[in-house]
Every structure is written in structure tokens, then in C-alpha cells.
Amino acid sequence: MARILGIDPGSRITGYGLIETNNKKTVYIAAGCIRAGEGGLAERLGQIFQGITGIIQAYHPDEVAVEQVFMHQNPGSALKLGQARGAAICAAVNAVLPIFEYTPSQVKQAVVGRGDAAKSQVQYMIRLLLKLPAEPATDAADALACALCHEHAGPLLAGLAGQVRGRRRGRYYR
């Protein structure tokens, strides 16, 4: 059984989502957003670090999946997004958790079936796949999608690392 923390980093709003999988069933645990205040960038990065640290301490994930930075038209925005990712990754590294990174198109492909899917399509599919009563907030849905992407890619990554111990009904397990 693995508990996966998905993170959708942002300099103002960072989404997080937790799922638990036991090779047969994927269960929703929690999701939400860390809203960094209106302070300076350093203060917001500290809030992201502390927020992710608190989530890790509360839910004890086994692995972390983080969405990679995509190129913005504005280089300043891309740099701030990269710094927000760094704060979230540092929180996971500080907790000695394995970190896996996925591009936005990989995440969308895993959840919707199209790498160019709209955010509303991601929200809709997350609601269906995890049997949620309502669509989660955009950033939380992206984080849950990142966790689901890792859940789908996990057996492949484990096989590449030589960690696969067996196969049961078409799915690998550790």
C-alpha cells in the first residue's frame, strides 16, 4: 500500500492532493490549496515550505509527485514558479521522501487521455476517477492528477529501477 502526495506548485497557490493505492483500488485521502499571502516572494516560499511540511507530518506519504515547470511567456513568472517548486521539493527532501517529477502534458495524458486537456477536463476526470461528490479546486485537482499520474507510472519506474518483485493481474506490485 502506498500513499502518494501530489503537488501542483505555484507562487501564490500551491495545490496538494493525497491518494492511497493498494494495486487494486485507489482511494482519495485529502486535497486542498496552500495560499501564500500577499507578502514578498521569500515569505511566500517559506509559507509553501511550511505548508507542505505540515501536510507531510499530518498524512505521512510514502512518495511525492511534483509537476514540472512549463515555459511561460513571461520569464519572471517561470522563475517564481521554479522557486515555488523548489520550496515544495525541499520540504519533501527534508522529510526524506522519494520525489518523482512529471510534465503537465504527462499528467493530463494519464488522467484525461490527452496531453493538451483543459483544466476543466482534469477536474471532471478527477471527480469521476476518485468518486468525489464535487469537482475539487483547480490547483487541488492538478495535484491529485499528478498523484494519479505517478500511481500509473509507478510500476514502470520501479521496473526500470529493478525494484519490481512480481506481477499480479497485469499490475506490478512491490
From Swiss-Prot:
Its main location: cytoplasm. PANTHER family: CROSSOVER JUNCTION ENDODEOXYRIBONUCLEASE RUVC. It comes from the Bacteria. GO terms for molecular function: crossover junction DNA endonuclease activity; DNA binding; magnesium ion binding. Belongs to the RuvC family. It is found in: Cytoplasm. It catalyses: Endonucleolytic cleavage at a junction such as a reciprocal single-stranded crossover between two homologous DNA duplexes (Holliday junction). NCBIfam families: ruvC (TIGR00228). Keywords: Cytoplasm, DNA damage, DNA recombination, DNA repair, DNA-binding, Endonuclease, Hydrolase, Magnesium, Metal-binding, Nuclease. The keyword GTP-binding does not apply. SUPFAM superfamilies: Ribonuclease H-like. Mg(2+) 1 binds at D8, D139. One of its GO terms (biological process) is DNA repair. Pfam families: RuvC. The RuvA-RuvB-RuvC complex processes Holliday junction (HJ) DNA during genetic recombination and DNA repair. Endonuclease that resolves HJ intermediates. Cleaves cruciform DNA by making single-stranded nicks across the HJ at symmetrical positions within the homologous arms, yielding a 5'-phosphate and a 3'-hydroxyl group; requires a central core of homology in the junction. The consensus cleavage sequence is 5'-(A/T)TT(C/G)-3'. Cleavage occurs on the 3'-side of the TT dinucleotide at the point of strand exchange. Its cofactor is Mg(2+). Binds 2 Mg(2+) ion per subunit. Mg(2+) 2 binds at E67. The keyword DNA-binding applies. Its EC number is 3.1.21.10. Homodimer which binds Holliday junction (HJ) DNA. The HJ becomes 2-fold symmetrical on binding to RuvC with unstacked arms; it has a different conformation from HJ DNA in complex with RuvA. In the full resolvosome a probable DNA-RuvA(4)-RuvB(12)-RuvC(2) complex forms which resolves the HJ. This is Crossover junction endodeoxyribonuclease RuvC. One of its GO terms (cellular component) is cytoplasm. InterPro entries: RNaseH-like_sf, RNaseH_sf, X-over_junc_endoDNase_Mg_BS, X-over_junc_endoDNase_RuvC. The active site is at D8, E67, D139. Gene3D superfamilies: Ribonuclease H-like superfamily/Ribonuclease H.
